[in-house]
Curated annotation (Swiss-Prot):
Record-given protein name: Envoplakin
Coiled-coil boundaries: 845-1135
Alphabetical UniProt keywords: Cell junction, Coiled coil, Cytoplasm, Cytoskeleton, Keratinization, Phosphoprotein, Repeat, SH3 domain
Annotated GO MF terms: cadherin binding; structural molecule activity
Modified residues (Phosphoserine): S1575, S1799, S2025
Induction remark: During differentiation of epidermal keratinocytes.
Biological processes per GO annotation: epidermis development; intermediate filament cytoskeleton organization; keratinization; keratinocyte differentiation; peptide cross-linking; regulation of antibacterial peptide production; wound healing
Compositionally biased region (Basic and acidic residues): 388-401, 891-902
Region described as Central fibrous rod domain: spans on this chain: 842-1673
Species per Swiss-Prot/TrEMBL record: Homo sapiens
Disulphide linkage map: none
Gene: EVPL
Length: 2033
């Protein structure tokens, strides 16, 4: 029907893009899908309704035509009822269409306006048909003096009341209904305007004013409804998203069995860093919108505040849950870390115990040295034991802080206390942070039952609680490990003593050694004792130093701890020095004693002890010195860290505490200057960061020395590295924040200046406008002049509207910029530490400057509007005055003419003239009478015509009343619901059929016309069609297989361990010694062991995954073969027909309809049950009300929060709860009291009162005849009332028309008077507006006073309640006792728990399926990293073919003969585990339904009891009144028994029917689930394909547009370059002429400088001679040394190694090794002080060479700036020594100062941060610098290219080319620092001009690469040329420069790449490679500055000279005026090496 729907595919509401699946929060994509489905159903329903309206219109036209013919032929009208019914149906459908089109506009349908136009056309046609209907069937003969009349005042008043009485909300459904009704009402009001424009009469002005008020009120209500709908929709979406996030946190398992804590932590950190701030901003935006709407007095304040409160509470609960999640994650991580470390300690203790049992039992016949060696090994074991002891002590300390997580899942055996982590308020349950509760029940893992301090029990989320530490199991395990450690220490001591004893026994001589030999050698014994003592003291020192080295520093006070250690270390060093002296003395004594060759056991042990002491002393000495260096470096580093942190924290605090921009004139400029000052201060503090990095390097070197020599890892180094990185990041973040804020404020200042200028101009113009007023003395000429001037002024005011709009636009832009500034400040503040963020002052929501600008904008708009209105009003006054003056002049002319005629005529003529005038007067009277008669005839004819035409709006009024009829409203809603339901079903079925048909046709056509491989991508997307259950089953089988393999591997590992233990228990031999040492050395590094185990496990897992993938391929092959054999005999055409038959199986449709009917019956039964239950509740309440209410004197008021409103609400709820509990207890007590009375009454014989019987029977008896008569009379009364109302309305209408007609006939000539009466006196609209504002002010004052009174009352109530607190607690306990029935509570908790368990199981299954699917995808992704890539590709290709074949076979439906599709589906769904879980779920569901049935049965029992009570009571009455019949007849008792039996039978049958309905419902659910799954997957696939097609088309269009733009820009750039070259050439020629004279002057100056230089050099030589002579007299020497040692990180382990070890292992090649050996040096600065001053010399102690610094300064190898940099410490001595020596290395990339890779840093691909990576030697070449600057041959100096161009030494084009070459090879070169900078950095440092930035940026892309717009990957320029993203002509010069300077550059790799390797890797094409290799064909685009000939870049490099200091290439150039002078100069210029 709609014309809009035929213009595109969007007609059915298909969206232009499909949201991505699996969004992080999930809500936006679901909303989008829901909106899309709703839009599709809406459009289909509208289509159906519009078609029906069209049919009704056509049928009505036919029937009206027939009845019109019958009326003309005077026959009876036949189709009046059918026509009226059709028109009513069309009106109902039109109402629905208006509602639907408004909803479609809100859902942003692209063709909503066209649909609305179509609906309006239908409405006009229906209106026209209604008019024809009334004209034909409702003809009315009116009297001739009565015409049609509409009482507009009453109609408009009714509409005004209807608009004012309109409600808002409170929900979205009601709001949508209200919007639709208002749209209909708005259309009616707009239609009234057309009638009122032509209204004429005395009340026309009043009615129009009333209509304007109505129109304003209607438009205001429409705007209010729209804004309310937008706000409520945003709140609803945000609430749903918050609820989903809360559900995820609450449903998480926080016990020790948590599935993936690391994944949850990553997800939480990602959400906290990237999503939390945006979500908070959206919530704050919604709150701000709500507050703004409330402040603006929005009529829907109630719904807005309700949603605001709900959103605020949900957001607070969500933040509290985030706190809970953080705490629970910390508990889980601490628990797991403790368990892992405990396992490690346990394994270490077991290993040590086994070693003690196996290794340290010496053989009886072993050699004598074996015990000594075992003692040495035992010392190593003792060190390991000491480490384990420290770890055990740490575990014991930490065990007291570990939370008992297993108790969260175990039921408490005894009362257990839990703490609340956060505040929680769910309405029913409130928790406070830090409160302690008692855990009652934790069977539900997600909701615990806890008991509060007051004894009340509540069910709260388990995530909000934590069980306080300690964990008994953790404490017990730590104690157990400590006991095991003590036992092991005792065992170690026993073994050590045994070994010492055996060593002493083995050293005794076996010959005739007398037993008293020891006594014969007392000196030997004394020396041995002294050596033992020295050995013990050295061991103690070693242990002390190792303890210092191993123990980490104190986290709170690292500096104090480190200073204390250094102080202790100094004492230890002094003690070690004294021990060394003592050792030397003892050594001399021992050597002297041993020279005498003594005998005896002590003498034999003495050499061994002496060697041991010497070795240990040397080791301890080295260890002590290394630790001292490490401690000093760490101390320096810690101080630097604190200094840097203090500096950076100061800047951060300044930024955080920055005040908002004030509303002052120069505030923006002041803020810019302040930011610039802070930026300068930050740059000044850069040295602090540099010192920090140098201190870190020194600390790393010291730690590396300690680790290489003693294998002692520094525990504090990783922490210090992290702190340094964090400080560096914070420093850069501060700089970025300052730059960003400065840029924003500068832009805002510029915009503010523009706004200020525009505002000032407009304000000045408005103030100086001419003020012309109308004066009574003004004549016609003055009035005309003023009128013309006023018209010009009005036109000028209208033309100034553009300036006002510009000012408004600038104001909005400026406010947005300031808002952005504040947002950036808030974002940065949130990213800092909480301490800084908390200390920051509270910033206002709107900046003062922003408020000032907003106020200025409002004042300007107000002033402009007032001036425009005043001038327009003055213009109207002038026009009115002009008209009045014209009339006055005309009347005066007539009067003067008449007076002149009368004075000139005679009396006779006056008499004749009077007769003639009388005759003429009579004739005029006759003519007037005739004209009046004709006028009356025409009026009568007009009246007749008016009576024939119906008034359309009158019928519209009736339609509105028809809509408001309550009975018709109810029937209309029911019919509407039925129509909507049927429309939805029809639309869904139609959409499914269309989608299925289209899909079948498309697949058939594609299968016939396309090749199979073209369907690969689509098949891959359809691959997800198999059921999740089958995938889960397969994955579970694979997991079981993996677990089995793990068990086999673990068993094998245990066997290997046993074999290893058996081998270790064997006798110790010589070979075993090496093995033991090796083992001890490896065992020290536990991280390496864990990494090796992880690598082995990963390799085994990879092998298992690959094997599983191959097995999966084999299974798929077997499955394909089976399917092919099964479907080999199937014909495709028959299958296609069978598909259609299966799709439209009538049996299934009948079954579906039958099931739907059964479902409807069950729903009706459920509704009946609900009604019965509600009736029971109502009756129960009636029974309760029969007792007097129990009013307690003390009410419970539990105050949980300080907020008075919350406190009042809680008090009300608790009072209500107490009241209900009291009522229940009272009712129960009353029932117990009444039961014996009831028995007594039943046993008694009632008395008889016949009088009351008669009265009651007559009063309560209702005869059916009487009821029918009453109903008939009521209907008749309603008809009479309706007819009277219609007659009354008709009477009022006719009277109004009569009065109007009389007034029209009574008017003679009052038009002029009525027009002149309308004057601009007081605007009634403004008066009403002022009155309304006054009323609002009064109401606001009343509300404020009421609020103050309410606050005062609440405060008084709060004080009263606080005084009554002690009494409330007692009452609370009593209330708790009288709560609900325990059995019912237990039954309810059990039911809710089982339901939650089932939901949790289902979610757990879904989570497992997702995890397994992710594991499968991860396994498939890991296959790509295997070495055999070709085999993998073949397997994937085969897998795609197999899956394609499977998909085709599965899509091919079976034949008629083979209906096995359902059987196959059943086979696929059958899985043992799944069936078991399904059966368990079904059993649980049956149990729950049984329990529900029991509850229903109990409800029925209660109903029966209540009925018995009521019957008993009623029987008391009845028996009391009719005792004779009831007491004597026993038939009633028999009837009652029979009814009870029937009731039991019906109950049993009903339960059976409910069971059958349950089974049918399950079958229906399964069928509907299956159908929904199929339809959803099909729609998703269709949407995905449509989206892909649209995306492809969009990208193609963008590509074509970009290509066109690129071509246009290329042409523009070429034209600009031509113009620029011409301009620069002309300027260069002019500058050359001007520079000739300047060059001559400079030559003279240079000659004078040369002479001065020669004299200064002569003076320096003389001073040197004098100083050398004086050196012999007095000389002092000061030495400063620095040794440079190069270490290389091993790529796998990260250990340091020397270059020689790296060369031996093959990590670097020989050339690199030689270069690194050359770089190693040991520089020493020797400063000699004499009478002539100081002289410094650099000495290389490695080679013995000396270099003088003064000589280097004289020879200009170094500059004074470099020497000062070295003295200040900014230049390392290694680099300074190279400069002084004048040595240039062939590669700058291997220098000590630049071990940083020169590869581009903008590449998104991952790069290795290690310089010496294994890929370094794969053909990558070194890069050399391009032409870096200009060598001035006239002054013998170097200068930059910018300076050379400025001096006209170099033409601009050549300078531009040289700069582009630098940018293309790594950056612009700074000649002073030899550093390279990017284009932007170079522009900031002044190395280049701003005019050439764009070309340099284009050249820089050759180094950094470009981003592929499609794949978002980083491409080199060669790849970009191949893909067509860049033209080859613009790229070729940059590639040529890269090739000439060392090789091409790939932004994804390090170093330079030769052309051949680049060609092999696909970086460049063959054609481009040939162009690059042909160097002779390079374009000569450079100009030689000296010879002015054209050069290529290669030739220019050949003519360059090398700077001796930096090795940079400098192009020779000279000023033209100096070439002759330099050639004739006798001084030979210094050559450049």
């Amino acid at each position: 029907m709609f014309k809009g729907l035929s213009k595109g595919s969007q007609g059915k509401g298909s969206p232009k893009g499909s949201p991505a699946k699996g969004s992080p929060k999930g809500s936006p994509s679901r909303h989008s899908r829901a909106a899309t489905q709703e839009l599709a159903l809406l459009i289909s329903r509208m289509q159906a309704n519009a078609d029906q309206v069209e049919r009704d219109i056509l049928e009505t036209q036919k029937r009206l035509q027939q009845d019109r013919l019958n009326s003309e032929q005077s026959q009876a009208l036949q189709h009046q009822q059918e026509t009226g019914r059709s028109l009513k149906e069309a009106e109902v459908l039109l109402k629905d269409l208006f509602l639907d089109v408004d909803k479609a506009r809100r859902l942003k349908h692209p063709q909503a306006e066209e649909i609305e136009k179509d609906i309006k056309q239908l409405h006009e046609r229906v209106t026209q048909e209604c008019a024809e209907y009334r004209a034909l069937y409702e003809k009315m003969v009116l009297p001739p003096d009565v015409g049609p009349r509409v009482d507009w005042a009453r109609v408009l008043e009714q509409k005004q009341k209807q608009v004012c009485a309109g409600q808002y909300g409170p929900g979205m459904a009601e709001l949508e209904q209200q919007i639709a009704e208002h749209n209909i009402l708005q259309k009616e009001i707009d239609a009234y305007g057309q009638q009122l424009r032509s209204l004429v009469g005395p009340d026309a002005a009043t009615i129009r004013s009333q209509y304007r008020d109505l129109l304003k009120a209607a438009s205001w209500r429409g705007q209010s409804l729209g804004s309310l709908y937008t706000h409520l929709q945003g709140c609803t979406r945000q609430l749903s998203a918050l609820a989903e996030q809360q559900r995820r946190i609450l449903q998480q398992d926080w016990s020790d069995l948590m599935a993936d804590p690391a994944g949850v932590r990553r997800e939480y950190e990602h959400f906290k860093q990237h999503e939390l701030l945006s979500q908070e901003q959206s919530v704050n935006q919604l709150e701000d919108d709500g507050e703004r709407m409330v402040e603006l007095r929005h009529p829907a304040v109630g719904p807005i505040q309700a949603h605001q409160e709900a959103l605020k509470m949900e957001w607070q609960n969500f933040l509290n849950l985030c706190i809970c999640q953080e705490t629970q994650l910390q508990h889980v991580e601490d628990y797991r870390r403790f368990q892992e470390e405990a396992d490690s300690v346990s394994q270490t203790l077991a290993k040590l115990n086994s070693n003690l049992d196996a290794k340290y039992s010496p053989a009886p016949g072993g050699p004598p040295g074996a015990p000594t060696e075992l003692l040495q090994q035992l010392e190593a074991e003792e060190k390991r034991l000491a480490v384990t002891e420290r770890a055990t002590g740490d575990l014991q300390r930490r065990s007291r802080d570990v939370a008992p997580l297993p108790q969260r899942r175990n039921p408490p055996q005894q009362p257990l206390h839990v703490d609340s982590i956060c505040d929680w308020d769910s309405g029913e349950v409130q928790l406070l942070q830090g409160e302690r509760y008692k855990l009652v029940d934790n069977t539900d893992p997600h909701a615990w039952v806890v008991q509060g301090p007051g004894g009340e029990t509540k069910r709260a989320p388990a995530a909000c609680f934590c069980i306080p530490a300690p964990d008994p199991d953790a404490v017990a395990r730590a104690s157990r490990l400590a006991s095991e450690l003590q036992a092991l220490k005792q065992k170690l001591a026993t073994v050590q003593s045994r070994l010492k004893a055996s060593a002493v026994e083995s050293l005794r001589p076996s010959q005739q050694a007398p037993s008293g030999s020891d006594l014969a050698n007392p000196q030997a014994q004394k020396l041995l004792t002294q050596m033992t003592r020295l050995d013990g003291d050295l061991g103690q020192i070693e242990r002390q130093v190792l303890a210092w080295a191993r123990a980490p520093l104190s986290r709170p006070t690292p500096l104090e701890d480190l200073e204390g250690r250094i102080h202790s270390h100094e004492g230890t060093a002094q003690r070690l020095q004294s021990l060394g002296t003592e050792k030397e003395t003892a050594q001399k004594e021992c050597e002297a004693f041993l020279s005498t060759r003594p005998v005896g056991p002590a003498a034999l042990q003495l050499p061994v002890a002496l060697n041991s002491v010497k070795n240990k002393f040397s080791d301890v000495q080295v260890l002590c010195s290394l630790y001292g260096e490490k401690a000093k470096a760490a101390l320096d580093l810690e101080r630097q860290i604190q200094d840097a942190d203090r500096v950076i924290r100061g800047f951060e605090a300044t930024l955080v505490q920055e005040a908002p921009i004030p509303a002052e004139p120069g505030a923006l400029q002041e803020r810019v200057s302040e930011l610039q000052r802070q930026r300068r201060e930050l740059l000044e503090q850069q040295t602090c960061v540099l010192r920090l990095h140098r201190a870190l390097k020194a600390s790393e070197h010291a730690c590396a020395a300690l680790q290489n020599n003693f294998q002692e890892f520094c525990q504090d180094l990783p922490r210090q590295q992290r702190q340094v990185r964090a400080l560096t990041d914070r420093y850069h973040a501060v700089g970025d924040q300052l730059d960003l804020r400065e840029k924003v404020v500068q832009d805002a200042a510029l915009t503010y200046q523009q706004f200020k200028n525009c505002k000032d101009n407009l304000s000045s113009w408005l103030e100086h406008l001419p003020r012309s007023q109308v004066r009574p003395s003004d004549g016609p000429s003055q009035i005309a002049y003023k009128l013309q001037a006023q018209k010009r002024l009005t036109q000028e005011i209208q033309s100034r509207e553009r300036d006002r709009a510009t000012a408004s636009h600038l104001s909005q832009a400026l406010q947005a910029a300031l808002q952005d500034y504040e947002l950036q400040a808030d974002t940065y503040r949130c990213s800092l530490e909480p301490t800084l963020a908390v200390s920051a002052p509270k910033r206002p929501r709107v900046a003062p400057l922003q408020e000032s600008i907003q106020a200025q904008e409002k004042n300007l708009a107000k002033a402009y509007t007032e001036v425009a209105a005043a001038q327009q009003q003055l213009l109207q006054q002038l026009e009115f005055a002009r008209k009045m003056l014209e009339k006055k002049e005309l009347s005066e002319d007539i009067r003067r003419t008449h007076d002149a005629k009368q004075g000139s005529e005679s009396p006779a003529q006056a008499g004749r003239e009077s007769e003639a005038l009388k005759a003429q007067l009579e004739e005029e009277r006759k003519r007037v009478a005739r004209v009046q008669h004709e006028l009356e005839a025409q009026r009568s004819q007009l009246l007749q015509l008016r009576t024939q035409r119906p008034l359309e709006r009158l019928e519209e009024k009736e339609v509105v009343e028809f809509y408001r009829d309550p009975q018709l409203e109810g029937s209309l809603s029911r019919v509407k619901a039925q129509v909507e339901e049927e429309g939805k079903r029809r639309a869904g079925l139609q959409a499914d059929l269309e989608v299925a048909a289209q899909k079948v046709v498309q697949l058939e056509s594609k299968r016939k016309t396309m090749q199979p491989h073209l369907l690969t991508k689509e098949v891959t997307q359809v691959e997800r069609d198999p059921g999740l259950d089958s995938q889960a089953a397969q994955l579970r089988i694979q997991i079981q297989q993996l677990r089995g393999e793990d068990a086999v591997i673990s068993a094998r590992l245990e066997g290997l361990k046993k074999e290893l233990l058996a081998l270790e228990k064997r006798e110790v031999d010589v070979k075993e010694k090496v093995v033991v040492k090796e083992v001890v050395k490896v065992e020290k590094n536990l991280e390496m062991v864990k990494a090796a185990q992880a690598l082995r496990l990963q390799m085994e897992e990879d092998a298992a995954r690959r094997k599983q993938a191959e097995e999966a391929v084999a299974k798929l092959q077997a499955r394909i073969e089976d399917l092919e054999r099964a479907i080999s005999s199937v014909e495709p055409k028959v299958i296609v027909k069978e598909v259609k038959k299966v799709e439209q199986d009538p049996g299934l449709l009948q079954e579906s309809s039958r099931l739907r009917s059964l479902l409807e019956e069950e729903r009706t039964k459920n509704a009946t049950l609900a009604r019965e239950l509600s009736d029971l509740h109502s009756k129960y309440s009636v029974v309760e009300k029969q007792r007097p209410k129990v009013q307690l004197q003390e009410r419970v008021h539990e105050i949980f929060q300080v907020d008075p409103e919350t406190e009042q609400e809680i008090t009300r709820l608790k009072a209500k709860l107490q009241e209900m509990a009291g009522k229940r207890s009272g009712v129960e007590k009353e029932v117990e009291k009444l039961l014996p009375d009831l028995e007594v009454l039943r046993a008694q014989k009632p008395t008889v009162e016949y009088k009351e019987v008669t009265q009651e029977v007559v009063r309560h008896e209702r005869s059916p005849e009487v009821l029918r008569e009453i109903d008939r009379l009521k209907a008749q009364l309603n008809e009479l009332v309706n007819s009277h109302g219609r007659s009354q309305e008709q009477l009022i209408r006719l009277q109004g028309e009569r009065d109007e007609w009389r007034r029209e006939r009574a008017k003679v000539e009052t038009k002029t008077v009525s027009k002149e009466v309308v004057r601009h006196e007081k605007d009634p609209v403004l008066e009403k507006e002022a009155e309304r504002l006054r009323q609002e002010v009064r109401e606001a004052a009343q509300k404020r006073r009421a609020a103050e009174d309410a606050v005062y009352e609440l405060q008084s109530k709060r004080l009263l309640l606080e005084r009554r607190k002690p009494e409330e607690k007692v009452v609370v306990q009593e209330v708790v006792v009288t709560q609900k029935d325990p059995k019912l509570r237990e039954e309810h908790s059990r039911l809710s728990g089982s339901l939650d368990e089932e939901v949790g199981r289902r979610r757990q299954l879904e989570l497992e399926v997702q995890q397994l699917r992710a594991g499968v995808e991860e396994q498939e992704g890991l296959l790509s990293f295997q070495e055999d890539r070709s085999k993998k590709l073949a397997v994937e290709r085969e897998l795609r073919q197999l899956t394609l074949r499977i998909q085709e076979l599965e899509k091919r439906p079976p034949t008629v003969q083979e209906k096995i599709i359902m059987e196959e589906v059943v086979k696929l769904e059958k899985d043992p585990d799944l069936e078991k879980s399904t059966e368990a779920l079904r059993w649980d569901l049956d149990q729950e339904k049984t329990q529900v049935t029991e509850l229903n049965r109990e409800c029925k029992n209660l109903q029966v009891q209540i009925d018995v009570l009521q019957k008993a009571k009623s029987q008391e009455k009845t028996i009391y009144k009719e005792v004779i019949r009831v007491q004597k007849d026993r038939v009633l008792e028999d009837e009652r028994a029979r009814v009870w039996e029937m009731l039991n039978r019906e109950r049993t049958a009903r339960q059976a029917r409910e069971e059958e309905a349950r089974r049918l419902r399950e079958r229906i659910d399964r069928a509907e689930t299956l159908g929904r799954t199929w339809s959803r997957e099909e729609s998703e696939l269709q949407r995905a394909r449509d989206q892909a097609d649209q995306e492809c088309g969009r990208l193609q269009q963008e590509l074509r547009a970009l290509e066109r733009q690129k071509q246009q820009q290329t042409l523009q750039l070429q034209e600009e370059s031509k113009l620029l070259s011409q301009k620069t050439e002309s300027e260069r020629q002019k500058a050359a002429q001007r520079g000739q004279e300047l060059s001559r002057l400079e030559a003279a100056i240079l000659r004078e400088k040369d002479q001065i230089y020669e004299k200064e050099r002569t003076l320096r030589d003389l001073h040197a001679k004098v100083s050398r002579e004086e050196l012999s007299q007095e000389t002092q020497t000061r030495e400063t040394n620095l040794s440079t040692k190069i270490s290389i990180l091993e790529p796998e382990t990260g250990k340091d190694m020397s270059p020689y070890e790296a060369y031996k292992r093959g990590i670097i090649d020989r050339g690199q090794y030689l270069q690194l050996q050359e770089l190693e040096c040991d520089w020493e600065e020797v400063t000699t002080s004499g009478p002539c001053g100081e002289e410094s010399v650099l000495l290389d102690r490695k080679s013995g060479k000396q270099y003088s610094i003064e000589a280097a300064l004289r020879c200009r190898r170094i500059s004074k700036e470099e020497y000062h940099l070295y003295k200040d410490g900014h230049l390392p001595i290694s680099e300074f020594a190279l400069l002084v020596a004048g040595e240039t290395k062939p590669s700058s990339s291997l220098s000590i100062g630049s071990i940083i890779s020169k590869s581009p840093l903008a590449s998104p691909a991952p790069q290795s941060t290690s310089f010496f990576s294994p890929s370094f030697s794969l053909g990558l070449g070194d890069d050399s610098f391009p032409i870096a600057g200009i060598y001035d041959t006239t002054t013998d100096n170097k200068c930059s290219i910018k300076t050379a161009v400025a001096k006209n030494m170099l033409d601009p084009i050549t300078g531009q080319k040289l700069l582009e070459a630098q940018a293309a090879t790594g950056g612009i070169v700074d000649l002073l620092s030899r550093e390279r900078y990017s284009v932007h950095k170079a522009m900031e440092r002044g190395l280049i001009e701003n005019t050439s930035t764009q070309r340099l940026l284009n050249a820089q892309k050759a180094f950094t690469g470009i981003e592929d717009p499609v794949t978002k990957k980083r491409l080199s320029v060669g790849e970009a040329v191949q893909k067509g993203w860049m033209p080859r002509e613009s790229v070729l010069p940059h590639l040529q420069v890269q090739h000439l300077t060392g090789g091409l550059i790939d932004p994804k790799r390090t170093g330079r790449i030769p052309i051949q390797q680049a060609l092999l890797s696909g970086m460049i094409s063959e054609e481009l490679a040939q162009l690059l290799q042909d160097e002779s064909s390079y374009e000569k685009d450079l100009t030689d500055p000296i010879s002015k000939e054209r050069l290529s870049y290669k030739e220019a490099m050949g003519r360059c000279r090398k700077d001796p200091l930096s090795g940079l290439l400098l192009l020779p150039a000279a000023l033209e005026g100096y070439r002759c002078y330099r050639s004739a100069s006798p001084t030979v210029p210094r050559s450049l090496r």
